[in-house]
Amino acid sequence: MSASGLPFDDFRELIRNLPGPDLGAERAVREREVTLTKPAGSLGRLEEIVAWLATWTGKRTPQVNRPLVAVFAGNHGVTAKNITPFPPSVTAQMVENFAAGGAAINQICIANDLGLKVFDLALEHPTGDITEEAAMDERTCAATMAFGMEAIAGGTDLLCIGEMGIGNTTIAAAIALALFGGTAEDWVGPGTGSTGELMQRKLAAVRQAVALHQPHLQDPLEVLRCLGGREIAAMAGAILAARMEKIPVIVDGFVASAAAAVLYAANPEAIDHCMFGQVSAEPGHRKLLAKMGKEPLLDLGMRLGEGTGAALAANIVKAAALCHSGMATFEQAGVSASK
């Protein structure tokens, strides 16, 4: 803990002093790229992806050998306001489904040869109802961020982050509204299927929560504490830990992007090592990516969460790395280069 004794101070210091890019590694990749057996620039965004990998791993021939999907699960007190068609018990049931191998993310990880870890964040103790009280106190929020930092403990060279939590698109919308302004209508979408009266209650909950906590919302970490969820705090911690350990990150959908947005609001450079795997069908996600100046890799109309979009995008990143490291140069292949 910091000398001040305030749990967030250590994180504020960390966010201010994150390691920067390795421009030498990026330059080496770009220099090799023009020697490979293809017209310059013909692999399009794959060439930018491998340069990004080099920049944040510090490796001049970046590889992806141990990709990991980390899924964080949390429950939310705001679901008591009847904002979603599914009960919060579904969160724990889906965690069991992940463990049994029966969810979409399990199949995508199998298809793409990705590791999978699922983190159950005190599901029996939902966060506070954000329309009535703060989601967490500072100590709990900081401890949850620290827990999320342990996601990389087993070793990985590409981290995909995702989540599971009934009610958490409401939480993500509240965070986005607090960080970037606008109206609740700008950020609130159907989530797991909220329409009609459910949607009206969801909109009202977001408005009420942001109004209630307004005096605290100038500080992004306070936004996370007041309006966030344990899975969102843990994802923010995982993103920070990955930066410290030179591990690139692929962020999944709207909720995972809300975790990244908290860090972005504190320091826009804090998520430079992050790529956004997809743009969700949840309407607020496209707006959120635009606010952060991020372009997603995929647009497949998905809105499941679970890290599914990030996991699909991981295969593109793996392919980019292999194209760069495995392709022959013009000289090696005896192919004539362009004049």
Swiss-Prot record:
The gene is cobT. Belongs to the CobT family. Gene3D superfamilies: 1.10.1610.10, 3.40.50.10210. This is Nicotinate-nucleotide--dimethylbenzimidazole phosphoribosyltransferase. CDD domains: DMB-PRT_CobT (cd02439). Its EC number is 2.4.2.21. The active site is at residue 306. The lineage of its organism: Bacteria, Pseudomonadati, Pseudomonadota, Alphaproteobacteria, Hyphomicrobiales. Keywords: Cobalamin biosynthesis, Glycosyltransferase, Transferase. Pathway: Nucleoside biosynthesis; alpha-ribazole biosynthesis; alpha-ribazole from 5,6-dimethylbenzimidazole: step 1/2.
